[in-house]
């Protein structure tokens, strides 16, 4: 519907109240009279300027503390940091010397750790040099003495390294050469570190106390000035803004009660004056609106009947939608319960597959250990067979030697027999020789008997060796067959493991799919429940619409009565 002239007047006044006014008079007083925003900005600007001057004064008092703090950071604090860094690097240097002694037996390792030692030494010298550059007076002399002491310590360590190398990389010799030489340097560095930290802490405490005093004084001054500015601003705002606004509120309250008889008097040219002009325009606009409402009430009465019929049709459709949605939600809940059962069974199957896979893995490990044991036993059997065969060969050689000895014994026996015959022919002259020949023959017979017994024992040993070799060879063939069977069993276990792994993956996929299906079903069920709830809510709203449409006719009548109460 096009805007009425009264409506356009209200909009123009409201825009004029929001847009800054560009005054034609260039004087500052005219600008302040025509712009409430300028008055507020002047008030706020003056307040902020006063607070800014006070803050600048406080900031100026803090500048000296900031400068002192910067000097602290560049002087004592920096010196304390450098001495801490030098102390840390010196400990690293001592540690690298221990690495040279303990791990430098090989040339490559000794060179590596000695290079690291020299790098740590250079780092300490560099840090002490930087500390000397920032130090002054007695502190600088002490730093130079410490640096010179550290150089002498490096010379002593190099002499100790030379003794270490001359002693064939003996760590005891190297350690004895440098025992206690780092104590003086360590003590000087620790003393200097404690003094620097103490000086830094004292200086920092002094600066902090001064800064706290300055901040406290500045805060008190700033708070007092802020209270004074706030009270002055409150008085000015109450006189120039609050009281005129209260008068406007009273006039608008009369408009809200339907009293359009009086117009507000306008004496100001700023935004509040424009707001008063807009209130008068609003009063004219409302009078026109109430005339239009009287005409619209009649049209509203006729439209309420049509709305009631449409609401009845919507109520029937909503009840049918609610019934169908409830049935689908019940089916989705049943499907979700079924999917949860499938996921649980798939999870149980996956856990069972995991247990079977673990058992198969343990069985495979046992099989592999058995195969290794059989292989080692087969090697031992091969070695035993070789030893037995060597024993058989040695027994054969011994038998040959015994055959030679037996032949010699038989020849000796024949010679002794011939000697006895010759001694008997010689009579008394050969009696002594006959006794000796008889003894020789007796010894030859005993030798032959012993050789026969030894030969019998060797035959027994050879037979036993042959039987043992055959038995071991038979056991070896059986162990090879057993090893092959164990290997086949291991292969089958690996196949079982792979199959169980595949089953486990499939069970997990099934469980995942079932869980996803459950989640989707639950989401659908929730959505259906929400749809059912929305349908129920829509049904209630449609029923309310039906009731509202029935009451709409009565309300239009009441509206007509209310319009009669307005006083133009």
UniProtKB/Swiss-Prot annotation:
<dbReference type="InterPro" id="IPR004089">
    <property type="entry name" value="MCPsignal_dom"/>
</dbReference>
<comment type="similarity">
    <text>Belongs to the methyl-accepting chemotaxis (MCP) protein family.</text>
</comment>
<dbReference type="GO" id="GO:0010247">
    <property type="term" value="P:detection of phosphate ion"/>
</dbReference>
<feature type="domain" description="Methyl-accepting transducer">
    <location>
        <begin position="296"/>
        <end position="532"/>
    </location>
</feature>
<feature type="domain" description="HAMP">
    <location>
        <begin position="239"/>
        <end position="291"/>
    </location>
</feature>
<dbReference type="GO" id="GO:0004888">
    <property type="term" value="F:transmembrane signaling receptor activity"/>
</dbReference>
<feature type="topological domain" description="Periplasmic">
    <location>
        <begin position="61"/>
        <end position="216"/>
    </location>
</feature>
<feature type="topological domain" description="Cytoplasmic">
    <location>
        <begin position="238"/>
        <end position="568"/>
    </location>
</feature>
<keyword id="KW-0812">Transmembrane</keyword>
<dbReference type="GO" id="GO:0007165">
    <property type="term" value="P:signal transduction"/>
</dbReference>
<dbReference type="GO" id="GO:0005886">
    <property type="term" value="C:plasma membrane"/>
</dbReference>
<keyword id="KW-1133">Transmembrane helix</keyword>
<keyword id="KW-0997">Cell inner membrane</keyword>
<feature type="transmembrane region" description="Helical">
    <location>
        <begin position="40"/>
        <end position="60"/>
    </location>
</feature>
<dbReference type="GO" id="GO:0006935">
    <property type="term" value="P:chemotaxis"/>
</dbReference>
<dbReference type="InterPro" id="IPR003660">
    <property type="entry name" value="HAMP_dom"/>
</dbReference>
<dbReference type="Pfam" id="PF00015">
    <property type="entry name" value="MCPsignal"/>
</dbReference>
<dbReference type="Pfam" id="PF00672">
    <property type="entry name" value="HAMP"/>
</dbReference>
<keyword id="KW-0472">Membrane</keyword>
<protein>
    <recommendedName>
        <fullName>Methyl-accepting chemotaxis protein CtpH</fullName>
    </recommendedName>
</protein>
<feature type="transmembrane region" description="Helical">
    <location>
        <begin position="217"/>
        <end position="237"/>
    </location>
</feature>
<keyword id="KW-0807">Transducer</keyword>
<dbReference type="InterPro" id="IPR004090">
    <property type="entry name" value="Chemotax_Me-accpt_rcpt"/>
</dbReference>
<keyword id="KW-0488">Methylation</keyword>
<keyword id="KW-0145">Chemotaxis</keyword>
<comment type="function">
    <text>Chemotactic-signal transducers respond to changes in the concentration of attractants and repellents in the environment, transduce a signal from the outside to the inside of the cell, and facilitate sensory adaptation through the variation of the level of methylation. Chemoreceptor for inorganic phosphate, which is required for taxis at high concentrations of phosphate. Recognizes inorganic phosphate directly. Can also bind to other components that have a pyrophosphate group, including ATP and ADP.</text>
</comment>
<feature type="topological domain" description="Cytoplasmic">
    <location>
        <begin position="1"/>
        <end position="39"/>
    </location>
</feature>
<keyword id="KW-1003">Cell membrane</keyword>
């Amino acid at each position: 519907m096009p805007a009425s002239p009264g409506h356009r007047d209200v909009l123009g006044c409201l825009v004029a109240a929001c847009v800054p006014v560009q005054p034609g008079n260039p004087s500052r007083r005219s600008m302040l009279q025509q712009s409430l925003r300028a008055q507020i900005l002047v008030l706020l600007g003056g307040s902020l300027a006063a607070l800014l001057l006070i803050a600048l004064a406080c900031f100026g008092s803090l500048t000296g503390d900031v400068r002192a703090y910067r000097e602290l950071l560049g002087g004592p604090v920096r010196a304390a940091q450098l001495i801490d860094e030098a102390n840390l690097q010196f400990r690293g240097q001592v540690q690298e010397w221990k690495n040279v002694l303990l791990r430098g037996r090989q040339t490559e390792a000794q060179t590596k750790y000695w290079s690291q030692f020299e790098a740590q030494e250079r780092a300490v010298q560099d840090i002490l040099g930087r500390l000397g550059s920032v130090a002054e007076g007695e502190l600088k002399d002490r730093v130079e003495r410490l640096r010179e002491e550290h150089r002498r310590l490096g010379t002593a360590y190099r002499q100790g390294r030379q003794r270490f190398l001359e002693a064939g990389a003996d760590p005891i010799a190297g350690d004895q050469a440098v025992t206690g030489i780092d104590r003086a340097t360590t003590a000087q560095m620790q003393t200097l570190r404690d003094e620097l930290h103490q000086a830094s802490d004292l200086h920092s405490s002094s600066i902090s106390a001064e800064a706290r005093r300055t901040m406290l004084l500045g805060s008190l001054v700033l708070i007092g000035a802020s209270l004074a500015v706030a009270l002055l601003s409150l008085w000015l705002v109450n006189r120039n803004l609050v009281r005129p606004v209260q008068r406007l509120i009273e006039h608008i309250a009369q408009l809200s009660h339907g009293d359009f008889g009086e117009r507000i008097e306008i004496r100001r040219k700023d935004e509040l004056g424009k707001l008063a002009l807009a209130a008068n325009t609003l009063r004219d606009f409302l009078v026109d609106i109430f005339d239009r409402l009287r005409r619209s009430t009649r049209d509203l009465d006729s439209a309420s009947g049509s709305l009631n019929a449409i609401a009845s049709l919507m109520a029937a459709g909503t009840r049918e939608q609610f019934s169908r949605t409830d049935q689908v939600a019940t089916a989705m809940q049943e499907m979700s319960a079924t999917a949860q059962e499938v996921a649980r069974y798939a999870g149980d199957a996956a856990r069972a597959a995991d247990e079977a896979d673990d058992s198969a893995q343990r069985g495979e490990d046992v099989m592999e250990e058995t195969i290794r044991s059989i292989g080692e036993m087969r090697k031992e059997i091969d070695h035993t067979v070789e030893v037995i065969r060597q024993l058989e060969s040695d027994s054969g050689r011994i038998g040959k030697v015994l055959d030679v000895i037996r032949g010699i014994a038989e020849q000796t026996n024949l010679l002794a027999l011939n000697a006895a015959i010759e001694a008997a022919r010689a009579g008394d002259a050969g009696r002594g020789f006959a006794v000796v020949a008889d003894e020789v023959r007796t010894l030859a017979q005993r030798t032959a008997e012993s050789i026969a017994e030894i030969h019998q024992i060797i035959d027994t040993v050879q037979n036993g060796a042959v039987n043992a070799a055959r038995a071991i060879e038979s056991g070896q063939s059986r162990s090879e067959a057993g090893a092959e069977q164990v290997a086949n069993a291991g292969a089958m276990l690996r196949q079982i493991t792979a199959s169980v792994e595949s089953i486990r993956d499939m069970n997990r996929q099934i469980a995942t799919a079932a869980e996803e299906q459950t989640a989707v079903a639950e989401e659908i069920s929730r959505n259906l429940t929400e749809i059912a709830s929305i349908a129920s809510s829509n049904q209630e709203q449609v029923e309310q619409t039906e009731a509202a449409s029935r009451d709409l006719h009565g309300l239009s009548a009441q509206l007509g009565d209310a319009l009669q109460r307005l006083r133009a």
